[in-house]
C-alpha cells in the first residue's frame, strides 16, 4: 500500500521534473550535486520522516523488509535532463537506507519482489485500458500484439469473446484486458516457482538474520517468452500514449507548473505555508509561527530547506499544484 506514497503531482512527468530540478540545482541556481529525487525513495522518506504519529519519534515504525520493498518496487536509477542515467541517492540526513542492500537492484525478500512485478503488470495494463477508453489506442492494434494474441489462444480466455468479430462492447473489451492481467499473473506464478526452486536448491532458504542471508537473485518474474512480449507491448504503449500529442501537451504544462512553484518557494520562502516553515524550524505547532525569524539567505544555503521544498511539492495532488501555481503567479482582483 505504501509503495507509491512518494508520487508527485502529474505522475511520472512530475517525478522526472522534480528530480531534474533537485539534481541540477534549479538549472545552476544552487549546487544540486548532492540531491536527487525518485518516488520510490520519497515513499520511504514519507514513512520514515514526514509522517509522524507521536512527538518522540519520526516516522511510523515500519519494518526494514517493508521499507526495503517500497524502495525497490521500481528502478534505483533515473535520468537527468540530457537522458544520462545516474544512481538515485538522497542525503544521509534525508533518508536512511542502512540494511537495504542497495547493491542489489531487486528486493531482498520475496514479498518485495512480488510487489515489484505486480506494479509492473498493473501499470502496463491500466495504461492500456485508459488509452483504449480515451480513444488514444486502437483496440485492434492492441489485440494484434503478440502477448495479447497468445493470451487469446489460451484456455484462460473466454471463447465467447472473439476480438475478430466486430464490434465488441465496452464490457467485452474490458473483460479481455482483465483476462490478460490474469494471464500475466499465472505466467509469473509458474515461472517464479521454477526460479525459486532452483535458487533454494543452490543457496538454501535465506534466514534474514544478516544482510548476507537474503535473496541475492530476483526469483519472481515473467517467463523469458512473456517477458519479451510484455516489453514489446510496453514499448508500443509508450508510442501510443506516452509520446502522443495529448499526453505531450499535458506533460509540458505539468513541467512548467512544478518548475515555477519550485522557483517561487526557493526565491521567496515566505510564500510557503506556516506548517512547512514551522516543521523546518523544529516547531511542533504551526499556530502562531513567528515569521520574523526567517532569513531568506540562510534558508537558500541550507540543503535541509531545499529538501523541504521538494517534500512539499511531492506531496501535492494535481489540482492542488495547479491551484498553487495560480495563487503564486496570477493576481486575484476579486
Locate the predicted segments by residue.
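Conserved short loop/turn motifs at secondary-structure junctions
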Residues: 1-2, 31-32
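Histidine-centered, transition-metal-coordinating active-site segments
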Residues: 13, 25-29, 36-334
Amino acid at each position: 500500500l505504501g509503495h507509491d506514497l512518494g508520487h508527485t503531482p502529474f505522475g511520472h512527468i512530475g517525478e522526472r521534473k522534480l528530480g531534474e530540478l533537485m539534481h541540477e540545482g534549479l538549472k545552476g541556481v544552487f549546487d544540486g550535486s548532492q540531491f536527487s529525487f525518485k518516488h520510490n525513495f520519497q515513499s520511504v522518506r514519507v514513512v520514515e520522516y514526514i509522517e509522524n504519529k507521536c512527538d518522540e519519534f519520526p516516522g511510523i515504525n515500519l519494518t526494514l523488509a517493508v521499507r526495503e520493498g517500497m524502495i525497490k518496487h521500481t528502478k534505483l536509477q533515473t535520468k537527468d535532463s540530457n537522458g544520462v542515467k545516474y544512481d538515485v541517492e538522497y542525503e544521509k540526513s534525508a533518508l536512511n537506507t542502512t540494511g537495504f542492500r542497495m547493491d542489489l537492484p531487486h528486493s531482498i525478500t520475496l514479498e518485495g519482489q512480488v510487489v515489484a512485478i505486480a506494479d509492473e503488470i498493473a501499470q502496463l495494463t491500466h495504461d492500456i485500458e485508459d488509452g483504449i477508453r480515451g480513444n488514444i489506442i486502437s483496440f485492434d492494434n492492441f489485440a494484434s500484439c503478440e502477448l495479447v494474441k497468445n493470451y487469446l489462444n489460451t484456455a484462460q480466455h473466454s471463447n465467447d469473446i472473439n476480438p475478430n468479430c466486430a464490434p465488441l462492447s465496452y464490457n467485452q473489451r474490458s473483460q479481455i484486458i482483465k483476462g490478460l492481467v490474469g494471464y500475466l499473473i499465472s505466467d509469473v506464478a509458474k515461472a517464479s516457482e521454477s526460479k525459486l526452486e532452483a535458487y533454494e536448491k543452490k543457496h538454501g532458504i535465506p534466514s534474514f538474520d544478516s544482510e548476507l542471508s537474503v535473496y541475492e537473485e530476483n526469483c519472481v518474474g515473467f517467463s523469458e517468452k512473456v517477458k519479451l512480449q510484455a516489453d514489446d507491448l510496453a514499448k508500443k504503449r509508450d508510442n501510443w500514449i506516452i509520446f502522443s500529442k495529448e499526453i505531450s501537451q499535458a506533460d509540458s504544462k505539468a513541467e512548467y507548473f512544478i518548475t515555477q512553484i519550485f522557483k517561487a518557494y526557493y526565491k521567496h520562502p515566505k510564500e510557503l505555508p506556516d506548517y512547512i516553515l514551522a516543521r523546518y524550524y523544529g516547531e511542533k505547532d504551526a499556530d502562531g509561527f513567528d515569521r520574523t525569524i526567517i532569513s531568506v539567505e540562510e534558508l537558500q544555503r541550507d540543503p535541509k530547506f531545499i529538501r523541504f521544498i521538494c517534500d512539499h511539492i511531492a506531496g501535492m495532488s494535481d489540482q492542488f499544484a495547479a491551484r498553487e501555481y495560480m495563487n503564486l503567479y496570477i493576481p486575484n482582483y476579486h
